[in-house]
Amino acid sequence: AVVNELGFDACIDYKAHPDVKSLAKALKEACPDGIDGYFENVGGHLLDAVMLRSNAFARVAMCGMIAGYNGEPIPMTLPQLILTNRMKIEGFIVSEHMEAWPEALKELGTLVATGKLKYKESVAQGIASAPEAFLGLLKGKNHGKQLVKLV
């Protein structure tokens, strides 16, 4: 459903794969030619599986690692792949790019308005639902961006 709805070539529910081996197999089916670029928001065994499927000189933009936010940090188990695949991994903090915000907002707004960019969001109603929404975010219960509508 997500593939057709959002226009993806493939989609993998990482939550349905409890370990690196299972997830790497699913990635191999979805990306038979390997992975050249990846935007990281999850970490944990998802990052390890992506690294196993990464091509030489793959690039990773790290924006978050939510898998380790609600407990002990989850270690990267295959750091040697950064070297052997000559990967470039770079942290990305949106607040360091605020000068690009007006242009990005205009461009992304146009893409959303024309239907060229689609998104998913989970909306909780009322401030009283905020704690549950936040905990759900940490447990991966949301779909897309988690919002709390105050009024």
PLM region descriptions:
Residues A16, V123-G126:
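A structural signal for short, well-ordered beta-strand elements
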